[in-house]
C-alpha cells in the first residue's frame, strides 16, 4: 500500500514533519491499587499534575488532566501514607491501609494557600543573587549518587482537537550525580511500549517527535546547564521577583527570567521556584522566545517536505523535582509545541500540538552496569517509529502510569473501533 503522508520531524524541543532494566514489581508480590480524583476544595474543579508519593517508598505518579490518578502499592508496604502536593496548594496526606484485596477509591480535596506567603516578601533579596546561589547549591541539594528511575512516558500529536498519534512507554532512566551540571553518562532504556495512530487518509501530514523518551536527560534544567543557562551565562538574563508560592508546604520564591541579549539561536524565558529556606529549585517553567520565528524554526524543525510552510506558535515546558530525605530528585517533565502548517498557494492552515510527558514512578540507587549502549534510546531516535519493537500485551500490568484523560481515552476507544 502506498504511503502518501508527508512527514514533519521535530526534536524534543524540535520536530520532524513528513508528508504522510525496568523495575517491575515481582510477579509474586501482591499489589493494592488506590485510585481517585483530586479537586480544589473551594470550586470543586479537578487539579492536574498533582504529585503523589507513597511515603516510605520511592513509588509515585501524577494526576491526569481530569485530576484522576491510580497507584499500585505493594501490600507489604501497607499501612503507609499517601502524600499529594501541588504548587499553590497545601500539601495533604491520607493513610493507606490493607483492609481487603480489592482496589480502593481515594478522593482528595486540596486547599489553595491564599495569602500565606507574605514571609517570602519579608525575606526580600536580589532575585538574580538568589538564582545564582541556588545554582551553586545544586551539588548539595540534589542526589550525589547514581539513580535508576522507572518512568512512564506518553507523547501525543493533535491536529486541531483530534488526536492523530498516541505513543506510550515504560522506561528506565539512569541519572548521574548532580555535582556536575552535564548529561555525560546518563541513559534511557525503553522496557515496553504501545502506539495508536489515526487511520484517516485525510491525514496527509505526519508529525514525528525525535528523542521523546530522552527528555528526562535533555530537559532536566537543574542537571543540564545547556538547556536554559549556566552560572556563566546568568548576566544574559533579567530576573524579577514574582508572588511567591507554596510547594510541599514550604515557601518558595518565584523568580521570573527573560533574556536581555540577542543570540544566533532563540533563548528561554520562564520562572524558577526556589525553596526560601535551602534554595532548592523545586520547579522550572520555561518558554522559548517567539519573537524571531525563523530562529525558532531552525531550532526545533529537523525536516519538512518542500512546499510546506511551518509557523511555530509555542514551545514550552515544565520540570518538577521531589525532595526525599533532604535530597531532591527529578519527578515530572512536560514539553509542549504548537505550530501551524499549510501548503503554499493554499488558503487554509492546520494547527498541530505535540506534547510529551514523563513521570518518575520509582527510584533506586544504582550503577551503570545494567544498561548497555545498544539497548539505550538516543536523542535522534523516533519513538513512534520504533514503538512496535517494544509491544507487550500486558503493557499496563503491575506498573504505575499517568492515567489517560477522558478526552484521550475517548480517542483511544474511537481508534480501536476502526
Indicate where each model-derived feature is located.
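Structural motif
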Residues: 30-47
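Hydrophobic beta-strand segments
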Residues: 50-54, 67, 82, 122
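Short, acidic Ser/Thr/Gly-rich low-complexity loop/linker segments typical of extracellular
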Residues: 58-68
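Short strand-edge motifs at loop-to-beta-strand transitions and within beta-strands
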Residues: 69-71, 104-106
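Short Pro-Gly-centered beta-turn/loop motif in secreted/extracellular proteins
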Residues: 71-78
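A short, solvent-exposed loop/turn motif at the edges and junctions
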Residues: 83-94
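Surface-exposed, low-complexity/disordered segments
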Residues: 105-237, 248-251, 300-301, 305-418
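Extended beta-strand-rich segments in extracellular/periplasmic secretory proteins, especially
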Residues: 225-275, 280-288, 322-323
Amino acid at each position: 500500500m502506498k504511503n502518501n503522508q508527508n512527514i514533519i520531524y521535530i526534536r524534543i524541543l524540535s520536530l520532524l514533519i513528513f508528508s504522510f532494566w525496568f523495575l517491575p514489581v515481582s510477579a509474586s508480590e501482591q499489589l493494592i491499587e488506590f485510585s481517585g480524583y483530586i479537586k480544589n476544595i473551594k470550586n470543586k474543579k479537578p487539579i492536574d499534575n498533582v504529585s503523589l508519593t507513597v511515603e516510605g517508598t520511592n513509588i509515585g505518579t501524577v494526576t491526569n488532566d481530569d485530576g484522576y490518578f491510580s497507584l499500585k502499592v505493594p501490600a507489604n508496604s501497607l499501612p503507609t501514607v499517601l502524600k499529594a502536593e501541588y504548587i499553590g496548594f497545601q500539601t495533604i496526606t491520607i493513610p493507606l491501609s490493607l483492609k481487603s484485596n480489592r482496589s480502593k477509591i481515594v478522593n482528595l480535596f486540596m486547599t489553595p494557600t491564599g495569602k500565606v506567603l507574605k514571609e517570602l516578601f519579608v525575606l526580600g533579596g536580589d532575585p538574580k543573587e538568589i538564582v545564582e546561589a541556588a545554582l551553586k547549591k545544586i551539588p548539595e541539594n540534589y542526589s550525589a549518587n547514581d539513580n535508576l528511575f522507572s518512568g512512564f512516558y506518553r507523547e501525543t500529536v493533535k491536529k486541531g482537537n483530534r488526536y492523530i498519534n498516541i505513543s506510550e512507554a515504560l522506561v528506565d532512566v539512569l541519572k548521574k550525580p548532580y555535582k556536575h551540571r552535564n548529561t555525560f553518562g546518563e541513559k534511557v532504556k525503553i522496557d515496553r511500549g504501545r502506539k495508536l495512530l489515526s487511520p484517516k487518509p485525510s491525514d496527509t501530514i505526519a508529525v514525528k517527535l525525535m528523542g521523546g523518551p530522552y527528555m528526562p536527560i535533555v530537559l532536566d534544567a537543574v542537571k543540564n546547564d545547556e538547556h536554559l543557562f549556566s552560572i556563566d551565562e546568568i548576566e544574559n538574563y533579567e530576573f524579577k521577583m514574582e508572588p511567591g508560592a507554596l510547594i510541599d508546604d514550604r515557601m518558595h520564591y518565584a523568580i521570573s527570567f527573560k533574556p536581555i541579549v540577542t543570540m544566533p539561536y532563540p533563548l528561554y524565558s520562564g520562572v524558577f521556584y526556589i525553596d526560601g529556606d535551602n534554595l532548592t529549585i523545586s520547579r522550572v517553567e520555561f518558554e522559548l522566545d517567539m519573537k524571531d520565528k525563523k530562529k525558532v524554526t531552525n531550532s526545533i524543525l529537523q525536516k519538512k517536505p518542500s512546499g510546506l510552510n511551518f509557523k511555530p506558535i509555542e514551545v514550552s515546558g515544565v520540570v518538577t523535582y521531589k525532595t526525599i530525605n533532604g535530597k531532591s530528585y527529578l519527578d515530572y517533565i512536560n514539553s509542549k509545541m504548537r505550530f501551524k502548517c499549510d501548503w503554499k498557494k493554499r488558503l487554509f492552515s492546520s494547527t498541530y500540538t505535540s506534547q510529551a510527558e514523563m513521570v518518575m514512578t520509582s527510584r533506586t540507587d544504582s550503577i551503570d552496569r545494567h544498561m548497555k549502549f545498544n539497548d539505550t534510546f538516543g536523542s535522534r531516535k523516533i519513538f513512534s517509529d520504533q514503538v512496535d519493537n517494544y509491544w507487550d500485551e500486558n503493557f499496563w500490568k503491575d506498573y504505575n502510569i499517568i492515567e489517560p484523560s477522558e478526552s484521550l481515552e475517548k480517542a483511544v476507544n474511537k481508534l480501536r473501533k476502526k
